[in-house]
C-alpha cells in the first residue's frame, strides 16, 4: 500500500504541496512539488562510495521539460523530446549553483539530481518549483548536505516587491530576480532589471530571502517525518604533519609566484613549484599519496593568496582592492560587420559584433510556457585558445549558454522597442582572452558594438565582477576579480548597469555569513567601478552612431488598410513573391496593416513602396489610367491598370465605331489609356478606351502604369 507523506503551505499568493513516498522508491529520494497546477517531479540518487582516484565532486543536475505537461505533442520529426533547450540548460544551472556549495568539501561521491516538469500552469514558471524540489529531495535523502534551501522569485511592480509573480505580472514588473539560500544565508541570485538602484536591488534580495523561510521550515518538517537516516560519512582527517611539511616547503615559494602578474608565466611557476614539492616529499617517503600532496598544495596556495588580501597587501597583479585593470576600448574594428568593438580589460578581452536583420531573422521559441519570438539575440563563445589551451570546438556548452544569458540580461533593459527600431539584432561575443569576468567584458563590448551599429540604445551599459575574501569578521571586497581570485575567493558577484542603475545582478556565494552590510559594500564598490569603465567607454563612443552601416538592411515602414493585405499577398503569396523578386527587397506584413520593407539600397525600397501603393490604391471611377493589354478574348480585352488590378474593355468600348475583331485594334502587351467607368460590388472593373480618348479626357495617371 503506497502511503504518501504530504506538506502543504501557502507561499505568497500560491499554494505549494510537497509529496514523497509514492513514486521512484528505488531512488535515494524523490518528491513531487506543485505550485498552483505546475508540478515538478525531482529525484536524487547518490552513490555510497566515491570512485577510486576521484578528484572533484561529480554533481549533475538535469532539468527537463515534458511537452505532455502542457497537453502537447512534440513538434520534432520523431515526436519526442530531444537535446536540452537553452531554457532547460539555464534552469539546470540555476538549481546547481545554490546546492553545490552545501556539500562538504571532501565529499566526492557521485550525486545526480533530475527535475522533470510533469504539469505546467502557464502562469507559474517551473524553475522555482524545481529548486524547491531539489532542496527537499536532497534534504530527505540522507546524503551529506547542509540544506535545505528555499527559493523565491521577486518582482517589482508599482514600487512594491511582489513574491513569486505570475507570468502576466512579470510583464508589468521592472525586475525579475531569483534568490536562493539557507535559513541564515543567501547563496545565489540571478536577475534582470529595468535600471533599478543599488538599494532597490539589495532590498529585493533581502525580501526574497525573508519570504522563502516558510519553504525551509516546511522542508525541515517533512524531513522530520519522512527523512532517511543520515549517511555514515565522515571527512577524511587532515594529515596535519604532512600539511605542515608541505607548507614549509611551498608557502614562501608560492607567495613569490603569486607576485608574478602575467597569468601564463605565473601558472607555469606555480605548476613547477607543486611538481618540485611533490617530488621532494615522495623522495623522502615513497608511501605518501601524490594526490593527497596535491590537495594540500591547493589548500596552501589558497591560504597564501587569501591571507595576503586580508592583510591589505597588494593583490596577485599588484592592484589595490578597488582598482580596475587597464582598459583598452576600440570600435569599428571589423570593416564589413554592421557594428563591432574590441574591449580589453587586463588579460580579459572580447571581440563583439552586432548584426542587424529583419523580422524574419527573429528567433521563434517554442517553450513549455508557450510560443514567443525573440528579436534580440546575444551569443557568447569561449574558445579554448582564450586561456592558452587546446580543446573541443563545437556547439555551446552550459557555461557559454549561461554567460551569454547573463550578458543579454545586462543589455536588454537599454534596447529600443520594436516600434522605435524594427530590426532583429544579434550580438556575438568572441572571448579572445580570459582571466576573469569575461561575461562582464561581453556586456561592455555589446554596448559598444550596438552603438557602433547605430542601434539607438537608451544608455551605455558596463559590467564588473566583484569578489570577496572573508575570515571570521574580517572581509575584503575585491573589484574586477581575476580568474584565480574567483576560484580562491568566497563570492562571485557580477553587476551590470548604466550610469542610472542596475540592469543585471548575479551572485554565487560559497560560504555562509554574507550579511546585508557586505552585499551593500560590494554593490557600492561595483557602482564606482562601473562608472569608471563607462567613462573610458564614452571616450571611444559616447552615443549611438547617427546612421546604420551601409552594409546593413534598411527597414522602411508603411501602413495600409488591413483589408488590402490580401491584395499585397495575392493568391498563394504570388503577388508578394513577385514584388520581392522585382524589387530585390524583403517584405514583412503584420496583421494590423504595418508593412516593413528591408533593402540594402534605398532606391529598391522606394520602388517597393511605390508598387505597394499602386496595389493598395483605391480604383477611382471616371479616372484615366495607363494600361497594358494582358488578355484578348472574343468580347473584348483585359487590361492591367497597375497594382495587380485588371479590368475588362468590352468590344463596344474599344472605339467609337463598330469593332468586328478585337485584334484589329489591340495586341498583347500594347499600352493603352483606359477610363474606369464602373467597379461593381464584386470588385470587377469595367474600362473604356473610347471615353479615354475623347478630346476633353484628362491625361492618364502615370503612377498607375506598370
UniProtKB/Swiss-Prot annotation:
GO terms for cellular component: cytosol. InterPro entries: ExoRNase_PH_dom1, ExoRNase_PH_dom2, ExoRNase_PH_dom2_sf, KH_dom, KH_dom_type_1, KH_dom_type_1_sf, NA-bd_OB-fold, PNPase. Its cofactor is Mg(2+). One of its GO terms (biological process) is RNA processing. It is an enzyme of class 2 (transferase). The keyword Cytoplasm applies. It catalyses: RNA(n+1) + phosphate = RNA(n) + a ribonucleoside 5'-diphosphate. GO terms for molecular function: 3'-5'-RNA exonuclease activity; magnesium ion binding; polyribonucleotide nucleotidyltransferase activity; RNA binding. Residues 622-690 form the S1 motif domain. Keywords: Cytoplasm, Magnesium, Metal-binding, Nucleotidyltransferase, RNA-binding, Transferase. Its main location: cytoplasm. The keyword Signal does not apply. Its EC number is 2.7.7.8. Mg(2+) binds at residues 486, 492. It is found in: Cytoplasm. Pfam families: KH_1, PNPase, RNase_PH, RNase_PH_C, S1. Residues 553-612 form the KH domain. Belongs to the polyribonucleotide nucleotidyltransferase family. Involved in mRNA degradation. Catalyzes the phosphorolysis of single-stranded polyribonucleotides processively in the 3'- to 5'-direction. Component of the RNA degradosome, which is a multiprotein complex involved in RNA processing and mRNA degradation. This is Polyribonucleotide nucleotidyltransferase. The gene is pnp.
